Amino acid sequence: MEKKLNEPDESNSKELQTLDEEGKPDLSKDQEEDNKGPIKLSRKVRYILFVIIVSTELFMNNSSGLLSSSSIAIKKQFNLGDKDFGLLGTSQGIGRVCGNLLYIYFNNKLSAKVILSFSLITKGALAIIFKFSNNFNILVFVRGIVAIFRMPPSIYCGVWIDQFGIQKYKTIMMSTIPMVQTGGKMLGFLYHIIVGEENWSLGFVIQGSFMIFIGVIITLFPKIYFSAKIKAIEKTEENKERITDFEFTQRTKEIKADKKQSSLKQFFSDVYELVSNPIWSISMTGRALLFGITTTIHFWVSDYMKNVILIKDKREVFVIYSAISILGPLGGVICNSIVNPLIGGYEKKKASYAAIMLHMAEVICGMSMAFLRNKISFLILTLLYFLFDSSVIGIINGINISSVRPEIKATGFSIANLVTHSLCSGPGPFLYGFVNDKYKEKFMGAGMLCMMFICAMDIPIFIIMTIIRNRILDKKEKEKEEKLINKDNEEGKI
């Protein structure tokens, strides 16, 4: 009996091991690192899940590319100015705010699998309905409703990578998110080319069909692949024979109680914990500005090429937009694959320094874009802008999510998105259009320059974050060393 309580059951532990293709336990060093997470799965399964989760970002962003590429046709059809057209982007921002609030509420009530599949299928159905809107006000309203169901998958993507991603490649996996998002916008641009200028709304039917398809695929997977809490309960049940009845009951109660903490008091407690965490608060502020400006530039870049750079051939616009959407973020992933070994991952101190330097390069490129009228120079600088942007967002996302305990990561990320879309990416397209309408007679790149001045505000924000973060990390390291010294001293006395 004593042996059962103190020694691991070899038969049960073998069942928990990951098996390779030959059915033998795979105990490589990297695999052991991966298995420190909440789920023990083979890398093959992790990669499949990663592709499915990230593909939701690919198809959700099609609508942004569709609207951007169809700006002239939409403005002509509904007789709109830049300010009015910007309302389509702003309504999306308002919808995202509502989507964040709903996600925060339902996160602890429903499983991640249910939230993901329902959001994707509903968004797909609404995107198809978008095709039949002939009134601009209805178009703006439906655009906002569609954006509500966009947020849960978008929030969960980063959370899933942080919790279940392959340990060695987490920074790179985080960097693929902006790449896939811009790739999705480019795909929306491609829909526009396929269906034609006058039939731009048909592109939403294509997008909606893909969204429903991905949502149905997710329903086919076990829900334990999307929820660490469910897996934790199963692990406790599997190990029931190796612990006492009291321990089993306590662990199960704690896990289930944590899952049901959806009361208003608990929510405000979580929010207070997040806001009082300086690393989370400051990185969230910087991320909000950065993401808001990037979203606005993506919304307007096609219109900018047509009306400021004066590229009239829509196929040429598509080629340049595609290059920006694919090569820029892809370069960011490559950049982070080089930077990641040097900084040791986004949990380390060097990550903050890397974010500052990369963002300074991003601001320089962005400021220069507003003064250029040559399409080759514009293409090169825009590519560099999105390359640096993708790198910075990957690092900042990692710093933000990893700065809080696992139980409130999803809540923290959803609140960060709430702030981003309510204060930055929501008003961004409208602000760009407003500035452009007012000052474009004096300076054609007025809207772009305004956005880049706001983007530059992130430099002092990231510097402050770095100073505070370094102090906190130094304090934790010192406490860790003191514990080791005390432990050695106690062992020496014994």
Regions found by a protein language model. Give the residues of each.
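Cytoplasmic helix-loop-helix junction between adjacent transmembrane helices
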Residues: 142-180
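Structural signature of the two symmetry-related core transmembrane helices
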Residues: 114-128, 350-367
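Extracytoplasmic
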Residues: 48-82, 297-302
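Extracytoplasmic gate region of multi-pass secondary transporters
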Residues: 67-68, 277-336, 393, 397, ...
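Helix-loop-helix hairpin linking two adjacent transmembrane segments in secondary transporters
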Residues: 177-228
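Residue-level signature of mid-helix packing/kink "hotspots" within the transmembrane helices
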Residues: 65, 92-101, 151, 185-186, ...
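Cytosolic juxtamembrane N-terminal segment immediately preceding the first transmembrane helix
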Residues: 2-62
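Conserved MFS/SLC helix-loop-helix module at the cytosolic interface between two early adjacent transmembrane helices
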Residues: 98-136
